[in-house]
């Protein structure tokens, strides 16, 4: 790793402060269940009506209005990811990112928020037009210590603090290990670090923004309790496109690595635009602080949500209708459900213009 821009101390975030909840009453706010945009209908020349569905049938569906560019991308604007209910769009002509809360079910319809980030800086021999994903270190980019991380396809990883409007700028890192070129960045609240799983899931890279370090911490994973697969299962796995997803349960403090195995539906190349992928297998590993990744078919009351958003976990018992011990998956052309107990997969083909799961949001009255 190499830090290629001058150090900006404003980027570093403080160590988290622990707050003890009152013993006399619950401090947990009422929250929406996880949700996603099920469909959209044009509403005038510049907006669409979003049909938002929740992961539990016991919560009423919602209709929201949003700018058309958030669901119908063009050469000028592309949505590139989501974190904590904030969607990021890349404005190609000016080379800047903008954060929107339009897809957040509790955000204002009449007064949506827009946060413009500083102009992107492209490092030598890097690119900033294709983005793997974005991650926020806290619930809102308006919070003073919130850091936005952007992982670009290839070498570059960039950070900034949106709340520092007067002197906000990007803090750019160049990654040389090719196993991280297509990785997705996530923020670990437990470790107070941004983390990247390497391709194949053998290596984890972590950046501690509380310390002035120009190099990340690396951790090699050791796999345990691997399942015995038949020859046919191994051949299927080897023929799949594999992706790794790091997800943290904030309620239990556990960390999981999820491996997805997907195949093209009609045998076309992944390089062909619009290629349909179908989930053929899922493997979940519980990862400890020592780098042990233990295969598991039991995550208890938890449900994991994977999409083009930053992955997240919820306690299923907190949201009646959400299935425990499941992985929910949402992609551009598929929604699927994986049951860890028996490794069964239910998959549906559908076109999603905004394939983002939104995590639970606090409901304010």
Placement of each model-derived feature along the sequence:
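Generic structural signal for residues positioned in beta-strands
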Residues: 36, 147, 184, 245, ...
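Pocket-edge structural micro-motifs
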Residues: 38-40, 91, 101, 259, ...
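N-terminal non-cleavable signal-anchor helices
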Residues: 18-20, 38, 69, 248, ...
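A sequence/structural signal of beta-propeller blade repeats
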Residues: 74-76, 80-267
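Short, surface-exposed loop and linker segments with low hydrophobicity and enrichment for Pro/Ser/Thr
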Residues: 18-34, 43-44, 135-145, 244-252, ...
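Detector for intrinsically disordered, low-structure N-terminal pre-sequences
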Residues: 16-18, 36, 47, 67, ...
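A non-catalytic, helix-rich entry segment at domain boundaries
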Residues: 2-84, 89-96, 103-105
